[in-house]
Amino acid sequence: TGGSPVQFEKQCEHFAKRGMVAITVEYRVSSRHAVKIDDCIEDAKSAMRWVRAHADDFGIDPDRIAAAGGSAGGHLAACTAVIDKFDASSDDKAISAKPNALVLFNPALAIAWDERMPKEFRELAQQKMSGRSHAPIQDVSPLTYASTKQPPCVIFFGTDDRLLQGARLYQEDSKKAGNLCEIVTYEGQGHGFFNSGEHYDLTL
């Protein structure tokens, strides 16, 4: 909704000092651009294709590109790995938008109702997500595609974050499909815990 490319600048600087190429991405958000979720997915996939297309310019190995993000940005990073639709018409589809690894910070991985969730979540999901996507909300929820082949994934979560349950379902389906998907939890922490203090250092 209100993401900014400055969110992970400190993390980018940390890895750049260690010889990695780190890029922050600006994408359209609903609070500033009156867009829907599938539009944001288009932007994320376009960004991945741009990085891969310009890999030689930046000294990047195009087969070793990780996508990372927090909260809604984590949702979009996951979408680049698991969703094959929602491509911008201007994109060169011959260039893969799929990352080779995922690093996700309290991502929204289950934004549509799933029968394994508590019944009270159904009403919450319908209320929060109604009208947020041009496509059916199931089509823009990473959990829908968790059982497909995907890159290795590490997910950081505070145990008090209500999004953790959806991530557990995502991990369950992903592992059943033979994918590597690990969740690292931090006791008593809520949403966005990694932004400052000791947990910023612990999640680097």
Question: Where do the protein language model's features map onto the residues?
Answer:
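A fold-wide structural signal in alpha/beta-hydrolase
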Residues: H14-R28, A66, E182
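Conserved alpha/beta-hydrolase "acid-adjacent" motif
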Residues: R162-R168
